[in-house]
């Protein structure tokens, strides 16, 4: 069986220098030396200052903290988000004390379109969490204008977008951008989160909330929690950052080969085809039923994944929340499928995967 994904974190030898530094410092959490180094290197990677970056324990909590930090409209308790996302997005909204209101996504970009949100939803909303789908760039300028025009704070769930940020239209600004460091993400620390924002006050509020509401002393100034990123996860993150140029090169080469082969198949679209970013996903959209294609590939020893299933509004945990018709979400749930994609996937395996997809799709092409 060819697995749909195989995480690959830094090897023990690559971690050892950082682990030795932890042993020497005997500082294991609470903004230790590796935490400071990791934050500084991330800031330099994106051309930011240290005061424009904060690290927290995971991206689900990161979204919740960002929502708490951006001064949500207190008269409202409903936060707009796409249904076409991973369950962490609405869970984070609930953690922040809000109720998710699911909106449909644009047919081409697979993300919320600020110009298409319902006026009533906007009037009743405390905020918006828009999502970068599978690591794709987002037009942040458009969303900053939306936030200013409507007086509604916005947070960007960019869990898989480590590489896309700063490319194309995905610029860093006053909207907090939340990036996951989970083992399944392009840059991984096993678990963790990066939050970027050009407003140092928002970053400081997030840092404060993540540390029991403490500021300069151990006196809680605001309600908070414990969401600090420990030194061991920072060690993994630093080692991953050391290897990032090589990792990106491998992902790029594999992506290009996949694209070249998939282009041969009629009736097939590849999400993100031709874009400049890399991610850990290879998502196809077919004219046929994705469930049937998944079964066809499974019979040939190829694992696939409907990464976002049929949308979050279909999950039992979220069915009690306000849901309108979501035709694009429904379409994507039926017609999209995640193919195997990871840094050491062999070309021979890609050939086997694409040949099996072609075998199913070609006879059914319109």
Region locations from a protein language model:
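Helix C-cap/helix->beta junction micro-motif
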Residues: 96, 149-150, 300
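Aromatic/hydrophobic pocket-lining residues that form π-stacking "cages" and hydrophobic walls in ligand
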Residues: 89, 143, 206
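Phosphate-binding glycine-rich loop
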Residues: 27, 36-78, 92-94, 102-104
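Conserved PLP-anchoring active-site segment centered on the Schiff-base-forming lysine
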Residues: 66-121, 296-297
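N-terminal "arm"/small-domain region of PLP-dependent enzymes with the aminotransferase-like
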Residues: 1-29, 340
């Amino acid at each position: 069986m060819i697995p749909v994904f195989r995480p690959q974190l830094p090897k023990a030898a690559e971690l050892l220098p950082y682990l030795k530094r932890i042993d020497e410092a005997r500082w294991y959490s609470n903004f230790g030396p590796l935490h400071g180094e990791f934050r500084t290197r991330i800031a330099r990677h994106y051309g930011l200052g240290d005061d424009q970056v904060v690290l927290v324990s995971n991206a689900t909590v990161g979204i919740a903290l960002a929502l708490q930090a951006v001064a949500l409209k207190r008269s409202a308790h409903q936060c707009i988000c796409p249904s076409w996302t991973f369950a962490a997005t609405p869970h984070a909204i609930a953690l922040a004390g809000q109720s998710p209101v699911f909106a449909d996504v644009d047919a081409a970009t697979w993300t919320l379109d600020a110009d298409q949100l319902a006026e009533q939803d906007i009037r009743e909303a405390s905020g918006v969490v828009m999502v970068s789908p599978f690591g794709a760039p987002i037009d942040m300028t458009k969303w900053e204008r939306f936030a200013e025009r409507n007086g509604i704070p916005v947070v960007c769930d960019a869990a898989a977008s480590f590489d896309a940020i700063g490319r194309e239209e995905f610029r860093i600004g006053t909207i907090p951008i939340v990036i996951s460091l989970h083992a399944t993400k392009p840059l991984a620390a096993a678990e963790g989160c990066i939050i970027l924002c050009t407003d140092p006050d928002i970053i400081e509020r997030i840092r404060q909330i993540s540390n029991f509401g403490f500021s300069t002393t151990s006196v809680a100034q605001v309600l908070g929690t414990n969401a600090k990123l420990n030194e061991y996860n920072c060690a993994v993150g630093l080692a991953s950052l050391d290897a990032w140029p090589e990792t990106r090169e491998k992902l790029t080469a594999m992506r290009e080969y996949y694209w070249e082969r998939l282009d041969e198949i009629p009736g097939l679209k590849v999400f993100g085809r031709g874009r400049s970013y890399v991610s850990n996903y290879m998502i196809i959209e077919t004219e046929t039923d994705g469930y049937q294609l998944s079964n066809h590939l499974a019979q040939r020893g190829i694992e696939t994944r409907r990464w976002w299933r049929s949308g979050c509004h279909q999950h039992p945990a979220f069915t009690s929340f306000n849901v309108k018709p979501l035709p694009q979400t429904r379409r994507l749930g039926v017609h999209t499928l995640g193919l195997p994609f990871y840094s050491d996937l062999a070309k021979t395996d890609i050939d086997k995967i694409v040949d099996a997809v072609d075998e199913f799709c070609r006879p059914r092409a319109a």
